[in-house]
């Protein structure tokens, strides 16, 4: 199940006993998923949701808390709709429900943000408002570089009210307008986990954190693999270049080269891409990689000094242009 659907399924099943929280959740759902329509001079309230569980929860709460019956209409997939949509409609008593939920003020004017009783309510009301907003128009993407928890809002005032509710929960959320649509976004992974916990989506938090950890482990492993590959490539290029310089060093020094340095040089030439550690293991008797590196370094230095004294090209003259570029990079 996708993360968004999993969260909505879980919080739709969450038992909430406090009346103030149930009221705040219903108010938020109607504000973010609903609309007020005037039909024959009366207010009709509709809320369109994308899960049957959330729609049934809303229908039940409207009846149990506010005493109004509603009808549930299922809209089959079609056109731009990929899945079924569920519309909860209140016709009889719509005017009264609009006032009870704070969708309109005392004069019957629509509230553009969140109802005052939700904005000024307790922390549990802020949690309930977020729960309702997420059920209405929320989404959660998989953990990753662009992971986010978002709620599409009916307007900038509602977005700012939701940001304020998040602030009361000590969660950083930002209001954004994208192509004329107002959204509230939480991007930080820890903040997303904290908000899901506040919503009561405890199973989803565990799944989110597990996927997040798996991705981080995978990303770290990839970085280390890339790092190791790059190091191996650099080491191999350096070894090939060292072999070319050693070949020139032995030509310059000829019979004047000490045997232990010549032996290290011959190992380098015979095993051009071997690591220093591998060369040490091939030596007789075996040497440490530092001992091999030291002997090759002294061989090259001796040859370069001899070349300078003779006025002839040194060991680096044996490097191709590509070798020189690789060493410089």
UniProtKB/Swiss-Prot annotation:
Q: What is the documented function of this protein?
A: Involved in cell division and chromosome segregation.
Gene name, please?
whiA
Q: Cross-referenced Gene3D superfamilies, in alphabetical order?
A: Homing endonucleases
Give the highest taxon in the source lineage.
Answer: Bacteria
> Which species does the entry assign this protein to?
Streptomyces avermitilis (strain ATCC 31267 / DSM 46492 / JCM 5070 / NBRC 14893 / NCIMB 12804 / NRRL 8165 / MA-4680)
What name does the UniProt record give this protein?
Answer: Probable cell division protein WhiA
- Molecular function terms, GO-annotated: DNA binding
Q: Which GO terms describe its biological process?
A: cell division; regulation of sporulation
Q: Which Pfam families match?
A: HTH_WhiA, LAGLIDADG_WhiA, WhiA_N
Family assignment?
Belongs to the WhiA family.
Q: Which residues form a coiled coil?
A: none
Q: What are the alphabetically sorted keywords of the record?
A: Cell cycle, Cell division, DNA-binding
Question: Does the record's keyword annotation contain ATP-binding?
Answer: no
Kindly indicate which segments of the sequence are annotated as binding DNA: 275-308
């Amino acid at each position: 199940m996708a993360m968004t659907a999993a969260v909505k399924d879980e919080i739709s099943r969450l038992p909430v006993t406090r009346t103030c929280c149930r009221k705040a959740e219903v108010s938020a759902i109607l504000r973010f998923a609903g609309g007020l329509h005037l039909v024959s001079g009366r207010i009709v309230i509709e809320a369109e949701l994308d899960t049957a569980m959330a729609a049934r929860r809303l229908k039940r709460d409207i009846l149990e808390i506010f005493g109004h019956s509603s009808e549930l209409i299922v809209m089959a997939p079609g056109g731009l709709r990929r899945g079924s949509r569920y519309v909860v409609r209140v016709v009889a008593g719509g005017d009264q429900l609009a006032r009870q939920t704070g969708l309109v003020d005392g004069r019957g004017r629509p509230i553009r943000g969140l109802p005052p009783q939700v904005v000024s309510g307790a922390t549990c009301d802020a949690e309930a408002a977020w729960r309702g907003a997420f059920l209405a128009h929320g989404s959660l993407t998989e953990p990753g570089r662009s992971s986010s928890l978002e709620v599409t809002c009916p307007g900038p005032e509602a977005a700012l009210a939701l940001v304020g509710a998040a602030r009361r929960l000590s969660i950083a959320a930002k209001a954004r307008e994208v192509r004329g649509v107002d959204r509230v976004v939480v991007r930080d992974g820890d903040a997303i986990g904290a908000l899901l916990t506040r919503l009561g989506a405890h199973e989803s938090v565990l799944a989110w954190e597990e996927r997040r950890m798996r991705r981080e482990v995978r990303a770290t492993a990839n970085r280390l693999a890339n790092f190791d590959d790059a190091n191996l490539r650099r080491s191999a290029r350096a070894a090939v270049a060292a072999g070319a310089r050693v070949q020139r060093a032995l030509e310059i020094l000829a019979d004047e080269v000490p045997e232990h340095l010549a032996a290290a040089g011959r190992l380098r030439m015979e095993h051009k891409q071997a690591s220093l550690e591998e060369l040490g293991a091939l030596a007789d008797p075996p040497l440490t990689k530092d001992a091999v590196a030291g002997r090759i370094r002294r061989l090259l230095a001796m040859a370069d000094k001899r070349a300078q004294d003779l006025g002839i090209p040194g060991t680096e003259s044996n490097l191709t242009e590509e070798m020189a570029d690789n060493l410089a990079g």
